[in-house]
Amino acid sequence: MSERAPRVLIVEDGDEYLRTLTRFVPGPDYAQVKSGVAALDALRAAGVDLVYLDMRFDRVPLGDLLGDLDAATRRHNGDPARGWRHLQNHQGLFILDHLVANGFGDVPVILAYDFSREARRLEFLRRRVPRLYWVGDAVTPEEVLAVMKEALS
């Protein structure tokens, strides 16, 4: 009897990661959702072994973004356009917080973001999400597979 393929939930606002991973990193059973709320629903409904999470969500309607637009607007001197961009540019972190707050902090997450110059930021995030991993934009399929294997071990 063969071992089942790991279930990887891709959370992104486009289809790039789904297309790329299914083509170049075969093996896992991939599923995709396009918002944080949908990610939480998918985690509740099925046995997800790993979340592959995008950082930036700039193709999603404002109503589908997690986070407090009023707080983001205040943070950007009352500019609602900058507040909205803040939510878009950091949506992966808002989704990560949402998953942790709803009891899914033990599910390993690969965040598609380059932390190579932000070691302190990554360290801070790992205090809240110990099973947090990352891959940058210029990653090879072999590197993605290695990070997936590490995250699933």
Please identify what each model-predicted range represents.
Residues V8, Y30, P108-I110:
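Hydrophobic/aromatic residues located in beta-strands of well-ordered beta-sheets
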Residues R4-E16, L21-V25, Q32, A39:
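Conserved acidic segment of CheY-like receiver
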